[in-house]
UniProtKB/Swiss-Prot annotation:
Tissues/organs with expression: Mostly expressed in stems and rhizomes, and, to a lower extent, in leaves.
Positions annotated as active site in the UniProt record: Y167
A Pfam family per the record: adh_short_C2
EC numbers on record: 1.1.1.331
Known role: Oxidoreductase involved in lignan biosynthesis. Also involved in the biosynthesis of etoposide, a chemotherapeutic compound of the topoisomerase inhibitor family. Catalyzes the stereospecific conversion of (-)-secoisolariciresinol to (-)-matairesinol via a lactol intermediate.
SUPFAM superfamilies: NAD(P)-binding Rossmann-fold domains
Keyword terms of this UniProt record: NAD, Oxidoreductase
Protein name: Secoisolariciresinol dehydrogenase
Induction text: Transiently induced after wounding and by jasmonic acid (MeJA). After an exposition to UV-light, first transiently induced before fading out.
GO-annotated molecular function: secoisolariciresinol dehydrogenase activity
Top EC category: oxidoreductase
Amino acid sequence: MGSTSTPASSTNRLQDKVAIITGGAGGIGETTAKLFVRYGAKVVIADISDDHGQKVCNNIGSPDVISFVHCDVTKDEDVRNLVDTTIAKHGKLDIMFGNVGVLSTTPYSILEAGNEDFKRVMDINVYGAFLVAKHAARVMIPAKKGSIVFTASISSFTAGEGVSHVYTATKHAVLGLTTSLCTELGQHGIRVNCVSPYVVASPLLTDVFGVDSSRVEELAHQAANLKGILLRAEDVADAVAYLAGDESKYVSGLNLVIDGGYTRTNPAFPTALKHGLA
């Protein structure tokens, strides 16, 4: 329903930048890796899925341009190794895209939500974001520059029935972490931002809910405020590229919402008005 054409003048916007993308073996992470390489960056993707991660690298470019490192973001030693391996290979780190995130697999109701599932989602979504920021800062502070971008969600500042309590809590936490890190790391020339997309038909959603991407897109479009266009992973990748690169050199602490105005509207109001006037 929409296009994601790239202006010719911006094709080198990340030239000579070095980026790490966690959760890079699929979905938004994979799409962002493709875009970063197209824009001239050297990319290291990290994931727990070795086969998928290596396949993504092979499909995108040569090993000197894009490479894979196994990384569980909940393990300090894995994240440390990820950053150290990137520095050893490329000599620096300009961009950290903390993109790993998972959904709850237990019922929405607080009475039925699983305790261990809550801990698992919190560990990956929040502690994982903390660790990637910590180890990125470890090498960015001496360099006095860098850009850290997180994938949050419209659930970072809203809530809705059917969206698990733990997922909403973790995305609120990622937004809080973004704001807090912006305050400290700005003193070292490091920018920290996040993106909050509306529904994207990624494997994260389709796998958990057991539906295909076309069904996810159909439901998302029905509920969307902005009609006639679907939000794609490419649109989120474009936003991440903006925050990662020099075009946003004085932008920090921003939660870039990519939702077509969804969170600015009250969908119950026009429905109630329509029924009231009928």
